[in-house]
């Protein structure tokens, strides 16, 4: 539900879209009789207050169930007064946001509305600050991630770090792996792969030249693309516990108070570099092309679209159509 909030509501940005409207957009989508099963939630106002009461969580569950939905992954708002790489207070605030998100996630499970999903996190640290001491800052981020991981484990949750080029210690595929390995909690703290963001990993944005996988004179030749995707996903897939279906035109975008990160495109964008139905398989299948069955749901991520685009039913139907194709190609039954 975060596309209704991310990059919106700030000075000079479009108004945010409330949760009820986002749920209604989702509920109205239908392709050949198939509808969305549920939603992932951003635990941030005006959608969901991170300090929501138990009664409020019950009302939230009822609101979602009334539309025939379940909840999957929830996003912990770790950025505003927290950072996994900050001072003691900022790091404590980061862990506090994770604790509160885990509480909400656990309550939703107890209420029977959340059968699967994880808690999404990131380092909440700028790349420029991380660059001043890469080794020391990676160790500090990992230490904070471990503290968050212990909290998650106590709540029966797992944490998934979403790899984006805008977060320190997570801005390249190699740095992301280093951070996860340093954290050292593979059963609790893993990776959230977003098709749009990870595409930029292959191009080496915000990272040393050695982290770029494709050739310098790359022009999207199929063989080079395939080789790069195979190499990246082989390295990150063992850590991957949550997945975002998405499209990207290989550019970056910022909106409102959100830093430049991988640009999400509409599912049908002619400039999109991904074949969504095919390329999801790099993440959902292993090196032998066998379905991994690593996660029980997949989620569409498409942030910073104009509100008029968000208000078109065609937008949601096209997203659902892409999701159905991914499930048909790489899905599994429990």
Which role does the model predict for each range below?
Residues 87-89, 126-136, 161-168, 210-221, ...:
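Surface-exposed cleft-lining segments at the edges of enzyme active sites
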Residues 3, 43-45, 77-80, 123-127, ...:
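Active-site-proximal loop/turn and secondary-structure-junction residues that shape catalytic pockets
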Residues 1-115, 135-136, 143-153, 227, ...:
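N-terminal pre-domain/capping segments
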Residues 105-134, 155-166, 299-300:
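Active-site groove signature of glycoside hydrolases
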Residues 1-31, 103, 110, 142-143, ...:
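Histidine-acidic metal/acid-base catalytic patches
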Residues 73-74, 81-83, 127-130, 200-202, ...:
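Short acidic/His/Gly/Ser-rich catalytic and metal-binding motifs that mark active-site loops
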Residues 35-40, 73, 114, 118-120, ...:
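Conserved beta-strand positions in the central sheet of alpha/beta enzyme cores
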């Amino acid at each position: 539900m975060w596309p209704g909030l991310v990059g919106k509501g700030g000075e000079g940005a479009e108004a945010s879209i409330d949760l009820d409207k986002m749920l209604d957009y989702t509920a109205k989508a239908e392709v050949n009789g198939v509808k969305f099963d549920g939603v992932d939630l951003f635990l941030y106002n005006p959608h969901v207050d991170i300090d929501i009461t138990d009664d409020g969580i019950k009302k939230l569950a009822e609101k979602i169930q009334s539309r025939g939905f379940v909840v999957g992954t929830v996003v912990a708002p770790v950025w505003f007064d927290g950072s996994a790489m900050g001072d003691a207070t900022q790091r404590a605030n980061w862990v506090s946001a994770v604790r509160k998100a885990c509480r909400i996630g656990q309550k939703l499970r107890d209420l029977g509305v959340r059968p699967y999903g994880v808690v999404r996190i990131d380092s909440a640290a700028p790349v420029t600050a991380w660059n001043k001491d890469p080794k020391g800052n990676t160790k500090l981020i990992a230490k904070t991630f471990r503290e968050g991981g212990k909290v998650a484990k106590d709540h029966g949750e797992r944490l998934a770090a979403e790899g984006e080029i805008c977060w320190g210690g997570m801005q390249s595929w190699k740095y992301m792996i280093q951070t996860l390995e340093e954290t050292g909690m593979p059963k609790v703290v893993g990776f959230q792969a977003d098709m749009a963001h990870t595409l930029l990993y292959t191009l080496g944005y915000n990272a040393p030249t050695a982290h770029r996988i494709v050739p310098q004179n790359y022009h999207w030749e199929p063989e080079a693309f395939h080789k790069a995707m195979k190499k990246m996903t082989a390295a990150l897939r063992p850590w991957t516990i949550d997945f975002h279906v998405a499209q990207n035109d290989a550019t970056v975008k910022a909106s409102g108070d959100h830093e430049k990160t991988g640009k999400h495109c509409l599912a049908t964008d002619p400039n999109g570099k991904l074949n969504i139905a095919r390329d999801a398989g790099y993440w959902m299948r292993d090196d032998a092309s066998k379905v991994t069955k690593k996660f029980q749901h997949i989620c569409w991520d498409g942030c910073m679209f104009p509100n008029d685009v968000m208000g078109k039913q065609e937008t949601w139907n096209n997203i659902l159509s892409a999701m159905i194709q991914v499930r048909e190609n790489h899905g599994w039954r429990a």
